[in-house]
């Protein structure tokens, strides 16, 4: 049996937030995770009230602050977890992000009275986010400058040309004064630099020799330019956090990465910093897969794959949604697999399909990549204390909580 007061299932950003809050309250915390989840696939930025339908004009020249976007989301979607926080929404988001971002130590602080960070994605699209890793370039810091997009020889070099052309076109369409132009980068000759991938360049930048070669290559390619900014692929280190700052100090211009939304150096940095933050907070870690969670009126039991059972004063599900397995499709049904909690969409329990063939997954996930599907809004319902609810809207157990994307 566990000696922890709190068992957190999942070690992504939500699991970190839950663990830190419990530790700050004086609890003994054990975090259970068997593998990297969705956070490992995350890019180097996240939002608090994103608008995927925002036009380039809205992105380059936003009119709403993050605070206003938060309040609008809570007002317009009464089933969103934000709506449960009522008048305390803004302060709750501010305080929780301040704690988590400080613990991670590689992200910009959250400014709810601002417009967030203006980023470029590796798909050549401008995006606003609430915060981003320091290694990522904030285009908002160069409102009237030329921005060079570094093109490195090797696999995927054509993508950088596309990013430069796409950003230039979208900025012009939005009437923005920033100018984007591709800049070929010629790395210093080195045997191990033969057509490396961006993640290999990122690992190379972790070494003093690799960073020195990168400094030389960028300096030579810039040719003494001290105006504007330099946008590069996600390659500014994995295990060290000062690469971007060193480049900026040496070159005299802003240098930063595009946001890469799939697995890569930015996700690896986040996972590394989560591990460090949990350790520094005094949380115990168990690399163990949870087989089942049994909610009872007398308390919740967690059973590991090896048969060991754990109990605590509280169990917090921070298992994510579809990508990390917090919700799965079984027999055509969308289910929460560990505790058997009902799945809710827009405040209503997702009823079981009556057909023996199960549910049409297209009805759950949709057929258009540009529209939110019911499954994207699906999750576990909680009460105002974040206790997970059963099909009748009552707490499933007195000590079983849920948080994060699982909601």
Question: Where is each model-derived feature located?
Answer:
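Flavin (primarily FAD) binding-site architecture
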Residues: 317-334
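Dinucleotide-binding Rossmann-like beta1-alpha1 core, especially the glycine-rich loop
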Residues: 48-152, 163-169
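Conserved N-terminal glycine-rich FAD pyrophosphate-binding loop of Rossmann-like flavoproteins
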Residues: 34-73, 189-201
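Short hydrophobic core segments
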Residues: 7-9, 32, 290, 309-320
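Helical element adjacent to the flavin cofactor pocket in flavoenzyme catalytic cores
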Residues: 164-170, 208-229, 236-291
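Short FAD-binding loop at a beta-strand-to-alpha-helix junction that anchors the flavin cofactor
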Residues: 391-407
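N-terminal Rossmann-like FAD-binding beta1-loop-alpha1 element of flavoenzymes
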Residues: 4-31
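Core beta-strand elements of the Rossmann-like FAD/NAD(P) dinucleotide-binding domain
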Residues: 2-4, 306-314, 396
């Amino acid at each position: 049996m566990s000696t922890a007061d709190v068992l957190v299932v999942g070690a992504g950003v939500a699991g970190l937030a839950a663990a830190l809050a419990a530790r700050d309250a004086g609890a003994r915390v054990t975090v259970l995770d068997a593998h990297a989840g969705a956070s490992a696939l995350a890019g180097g930025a996240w939002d608090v009230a994103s608008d995927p339908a925002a036009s380039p004009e809205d992105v380059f020249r936003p009119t709403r602050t993050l605070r206003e976007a938060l309040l609008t989301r809570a007002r317009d979607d009464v089933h969103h977890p934000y709506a449960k926080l009522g008048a305390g929404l803004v302060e709750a988001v501010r305080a929780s992000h301040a704690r988590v971002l400080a613990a991670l130590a590689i992200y910009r602080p959250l400014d709810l009275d601002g417009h967030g960070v203006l980023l470029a994605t590796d798909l050549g699209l401008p995006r606003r986010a609430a915060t981003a890793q320091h290694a990522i370039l904030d285009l908002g810091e160069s409102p009237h400058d030329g921005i060079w997009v570094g093109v490195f020889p090797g696999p995927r070099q054509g993508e950088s040309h596309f990013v430069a052309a796409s950003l230039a076109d979208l900025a012009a369409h939005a009437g923005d004064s920033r100018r984007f132009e591709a800049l070929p980068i010629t790395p210093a000759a080195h045997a191990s630099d033969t057509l490396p991938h961006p993640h290999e360049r990122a690992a190379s930048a972790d070494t003093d020799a690799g960073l020195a070669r990168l400094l030389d290559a960028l300096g030579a390619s810039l040719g003494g330019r001290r105006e504007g900014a330099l946008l590069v692929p996600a390659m500014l280190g994995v295990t060290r956090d000062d690469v971007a700052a060193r480049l900026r100090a040496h070159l005299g211009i802003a240098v930063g990465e595009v946001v890469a939304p799939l697995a890569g150096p930015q996700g690896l940095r986040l996972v590394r910093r989560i591990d460090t933050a949990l350790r520094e907070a005094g949380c115990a870690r168990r690399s163990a897969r949870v087989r089942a969670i049994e909610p009872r009126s007398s308390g919740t039991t967690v059973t590991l794959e090896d048969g060991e059972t754990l109990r605590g004063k509280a169990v917090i599900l921070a298992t994510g949604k579809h990508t990390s397995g917090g919700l799965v499709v079984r027999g055509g049904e969308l289910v929460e697999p560990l505790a058997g909690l009902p799945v809710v969409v827009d405040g209503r329990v997702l009823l079981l399909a009556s057909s023996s063939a199960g549910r049409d997954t297209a009805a759950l996930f949709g057929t258009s990549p540009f529209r939110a599907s019911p499954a994207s809004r699906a999750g576990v319902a909680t009460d105002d204390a974040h206790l997970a609810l059963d099909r009748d809207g009552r707490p499933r157990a007195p000590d079983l909580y849920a948080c994060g994307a699982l909601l």
